[in-house]
Design a protein with these regions (language model features):
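Extended beta-strand/loop cores of jelly-roll/beta-sandwich
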Residues: 1-131
C-alpha cells in the first residue's frame, strides 16, 4: 500500500451504503430471477486441485463449528483457530449449517457462504456495487 504513506489527507466523495447486509430473502430473489449458482454450490474442478482425491471434490463451504473442548485463541503452531471451522460438504447459502439445515425462519438474516464473485454478481443485478 504505497499510497498509504506518508500520512496525508484524502478527500472522499459522497456515497450510499445499504443500511443492512443482504438477507437470505434478498439473495434468494436474485437467484430465482437469474438462475445464479454460487461458488459454494459448485464442486471444485479436479484440474484446479491436482492430486486431490475425488471424494474431496464436492461442493460445500466452511462452517463455524466451535470445538467441544477448550481451545486457546493462539498457540505456538498458529493453527488453533482452524479448530473452530470445518469444511462441510453441502453447506451453502441455502443450507448454512450443512445439507440438513435450511433457511426456515432465517429470511431476514444476512446471507452466508457467499464468495466475492457471488457478491459482485448480486450487486450488479441489484444495480449496486461493492465498496472498495
Amino acid at each position: 500500500m504505497r499510497d498509504a504513506r506518508p500520512v496525508h489527507r484524502v478527500r472522499v466523495g459522497g456515497f450510499w451504503m445499504d443500511i443492512h447486509e443482504v438477507t437470505n430473502d434478498e439473495f434468494g430473489e436474485f437467484v430465482e430471477a437469474t438462475g445464479y449458482v454460487t461458488v459454494a454450490e459448485q464442486p471444485p474442478q479436479a484440474e484446479d486441485f491436482p492430486g486431490a482425491p475425488p471424494e474431496n471434490l464436492v461442493a460445500g463451504s466452511i462452517v463455524f463449528t466451535p470445538p467441544s473442548e477448550e481451545v486457546p485463541v493462539r498457540d505456538a503452531s498458529g493453527t488453533a483457530h482452524l479448530r473452530w471451522w470445518a469444511y462441510v460438504p453441502g453447506a451453502s447459502w441455502r443450507h448454512p449449517a450443512g445439507p440438513a439445515s435450511d433457511l426456515e425462519g432465517r429470511g431476514d438474516e444476512p446471507v452466508v457462504h457467499v464468495a466475492y464473485e457471488d457478491a459482485e454478481a448480486y450487486a450488479a443485478w441489484a444495480g449496486k456495487r461493492l465498496p472498495s
